[in-house]
Amino acid sequence: PVMKGHCQTKITCALKNMKGLLPNKEKRHFHAMGLHRPIAHLGLGIHQDFILVDNICGDLDFEDGGNPFIMNRLFAGLDPVLIDAYVCAELHYRPEDVPYVKMAEELGVGSADLTRLSIRQIGEIGEKRVIPEKRKIVELQDAVEEVESCSACYGYLIPALEEGLLPELREKICIGQGYRGKSGALGVGSCTSGFACNLKGCPPTDEQMYEFLKQYIATRRKTEAEK
């Protein structure tokens, strides 16, 4: 797996990587159930005994990339839970901040106890880059109200917000399967089709989301100016 950030689970590495083996229909089911518990249980069904992690230039905010942070290293381990606990520490999270890591430990998939970590370095060690503690993903998440959203839909929304629209938004944007059959003010994706202002698509692209939100803001400004 690539060591990288994730817009919903904060990190994705050894444990969540196994979700890629599932068919798309089952992936959507994971989101409907809430990602963390199914990911933890997946670790019981798919055993990993050697994990080689690509930490060359992953994006530490979003799983789809776009903002690579160059580390130029690989690391390997035998315990997927311990690997993910280490990744949490590297990205300034505690294992408790990523619920599926602790859940997997409680299920017996592995250990999240970093005191059990034994690191052996191979090859020359270059200048170590310090991973920033505060990253934009947290601020952008505050603008979104998500319930059982799929990673693709959520992942496209975050870059759209990043394009300068965030300060102009007054309402939270609703997204996710949990809004099916419900009403509201502002939503993106087909699951929010009952909302007063909605962008359909499963998922709509980041360009479509950007144009939709830009138009939404422009319409609101015009309405306010006419009052």
Segments predicted by a language model, with ranges:
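Extended, low-polarity segments enriched in aliphatic/aromatic residues
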Residues: 1-227
